[in-house]
Amino acid sequence: MVYAASRYVSQLTKDTLALVLAGGKGTRLKELTEHQSKPALHFGGKFRVIDFTLSNCVNSGIRQIGIATQYKSHSLLRHLSQGWSHLNRDMGEFVELLPASQQCSSRWYQGTADALFQNIEFIKEQSPKYVLVLAGDHIYKMDYADMLAQHVQSGADVTIGGIEVPVHEAANAFGVMQINKSGRVVSFDEKPDSPSPLPEDPALALASMGIYVFNTEFLLNELQKDAHSLTSEHDFGNDIVPQCIADYEVHAFRFTDSLYGLKPYWKDIGTLDAFWQANIDLIEVTPKLDIYDDSWPIWTYQKQSPPAKFVFNNDNRRGSATDSMVSGGCVISGATIDRSLLFVDVRVHSYSKITESVILPNVEIGRDVNIHRAIIAANCSVPSGMNIGFDHDEDQARGFRVSPNGIVLVTQNMLENLREQAPWEHAIQRYSQPKHLHS
């Protein structure tokens, strides 16, 4: 059956409830997620990671959204209350927070399927025809209405979003699907050691994006069965999906093109290397992820900050930035920024140089500091004269974390521990730390 696209998609999205799983610990991000969940991480200069999934929902016409939260959720809840309270409940639009242990059970969420089961009454109250299950910790732009339309027209019970990735990247990282010519999923392996390649291209595998469309009644039945299974881990990838493939119609939606015919961009920023790379991707002349596209905006909350400022123009003391993104509230005072991304309210003092680095919000960098291929966590105060990213043995000896690809993570706790280990040296650095905004 062929439908008039605009009317059909509009009705589809109105009949859909989105449930965003936003409780991930993000343990591979090490100290970056020590005090917050992965979806709450800062990204792209002014956003939070979860903003991309939520913006996709709103831009797709899906305005009924539940967010299941769990791990260290304070900063996430604060961001959602500040930035995502604009939907109109009188029009049936909402972003509902669903913390663990406050629904039909007193226990923590035991897995992705259990997160939905504990909110089963919430799902029933909304009476949607379809439930769109999403991960809140991926970076991408996607029109979910296209996936919903395919789901209905194919007659599937479940549709799984999939993207082509190199086989070596899929190994031990993603759920991998095999599909037949009609798009039906015939096998699903969760994070296999040796992923099955696509028949038409042995270098690629079809990886699950963690996006699922369910017919609501079907989902409720499967959640009930899974909840009462003594052998289940209550996880979509390990339990629900394999069982559905064996018994029901499960189809794949292949995310083969992004909006407006661009090559799809989808990133799991679950490691330090991936987090750094996804941010650095944005500074390219033509980035694979276009955050400047007014037709598909990324919505967020950001405090009011003044414009970025660059001061001093002497030969050896020039405030400048090349091939970089510098956010509001930043002051570059006689320092050089190259191929880097600076979040809001970063201050870099004279004679310092930052290259190929990601500097998170509210960071102060002293004089004569050199930083290369690093992530400087929020609220750091980097003392004058420090070099980061040039000698990894020295970086590790100082307590900084070095990733497999050589990205150095620095947090304020690491800097404070270093100061305690060498109090005389750091007393001198504190004494020489700039006292003025423009120094």
Swiss-Prot record:
Its EC number is 2.7.7.27. One of its GO terms (biological process) is glycogen biosynthetic process. SUPFAM superfamilies: Nucleotide-diphospho-sugar transferases, Trimeric LpxA-like enzymes. Signal peptide: none annotated. Keywords: ATP-binding, Carbohydrate metabolism, Glycogen biosynthesis, Glycogen metabolism, Nucleotide-binding, Nucleotidyltransferase, Transferase. Pathway: Glycan biosynthesis; glycogen biosynthesis. It comes from the Bacteria. InterPro entries: ADP-Glc_PPase, ADP_Glu_pyroP_CS, GlgC_bac, GlmU/GlgC-like_hexapep, NTP_transferase_dom, Nucleotide-diphossugar_trans, Trimer_LpxA-like_sf. Belongs to the bacterial/plant glucose-1-phosphate adenylyltransferase family. Homotetramer. Involved in the biosynthesis of ADP-glucose, a building block required for the elongation reactions to produce glycogen. Catalyzes the reaction between ATP and alpha-D-glucose 1-phosphate (G1P) to produce pyrophosphate and ADP-Glc. This is Glucose-1-phosphate adenylyltransferase 1. It comes from Pseudoalteromonas atlantica (strain T6c / ATCC BAA-1087).
